[in-house]
Amino acid sequence: MTVGKDFLLNALLKENFFPLQKKKREELPPVFTSSDLTKTVAEDIRKVALSKDRKKDGFDSIQYKTIRFNNVPRLLSIPHPKPYIDICFEIYDYWDQVKHICLNPNSLIKPQTHKSGRTVIMDYEASFVKRSRYYKFAFGKKFLAHADIANCFPSLYSHAIPWALVGFSHAKNNRSNSEWFNKIDKCFRSCSRNETSGVPIGPAISNIACEIVLERIDRELCKQFNYIRFIDDYTAYCKTHEEAEEFIRRLSIELMKYKLNLNIKKTAIEKLPQAINDEWVGRMREIIPKDKEIISSKVSDILDAAVRLQKVNPDGSILKYAANSIVHKLNDDSSVEFTKYLMKLCFHYPILIPILKEPLARVHKNKSDSYRRELKLLIEESINYDRSDAVCWLLNYFIIRFLYRLLI
């Protein structure tokens, strides 16, 4: 099913402007929102005339760093509203020529109609969906081919968008800015200082640009291979090792047509069968009680186990999994224990900071004062390491828990 153009525009303007890619919106505190950027407001902004210099130089984005489970930062972007709005309306105006990307069976992340009002959510699928797909795709196959595009969004060539939309020949023979596909290309360039290389990482418009190009590649590859794609990450199910090698070879050839390349470090062929989930997932499921309120003494047992497993599996987001699994099962007493333990872990694993939101809110006001020092130290540490997301969340907590109380 395709996305309706009115829903799409509303989602792009009001829900998918900020880099809120995950279902839980953990990249930014809720104070960051574009909910007031309605179609009417956007139309007024779109009418603003630009100077010659601004048209020539384009616009830049605000760089925003989010921390991954291995503490390696990921660079996201908050685009300038003017060129972003221009892109949204160009996609809206020509959605009939673009909406086919919603029907791509090989892509797991594409524009959809989500209940949250967003059109793009870049989360991994539910475990039961993952299992069902594995049972279906892996039957009769002996090998998995894994491949990943190197620096996909920063490397995406803006001219590749027209190539994918109307074909190489037609795009290269019709270069007028009045052509609808070139209008989209031009708007994306304006969002990135009029450069042809790279699109902002984070807003849904970038996912749409990526899907336009990669859907065209999928059309060619799906004729011969059985595979799925999670944004820029490919998994092919193959009968022979030779077929797996051929998939990687063909994928590389198709990508190069659009000036994209494979990430050699993430290209691999593995023999089936493979476990559906990592070993640590099963271990954590054994430890965490199902549908039970977690008491204070159990909190430390669960988080202790997660710390030990994290050390053995540094590439897994075990602590985040454990914390998210129990945060909604706490009572008032265990919330205090959880907050104390998680606060200490946040100093070493800042990816956990957004999870503090709920337990901090439950902690009694008198007890919350004891976290003032910890929050200040975490803010200082996050500033020193230029952790944008951590600083935003911590300042949000600090203002809500302490400064706001001084004003009322």
Protein language model regions, located:
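Short acidic (Asp/Glu) and glycine-rich catalytic loops that position anionic groups and cofactors
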Residues: K65-R68, W280, R373-L375
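Conserved two-metal-ion catalytic palm core of "right-hand" nucleic acid polymerases
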Residues: M1-S178, K183-I201
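Polymerase palm active-site segment centered on the conserved acidic dipeptide of motif C
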Residues: H241-D301, R308
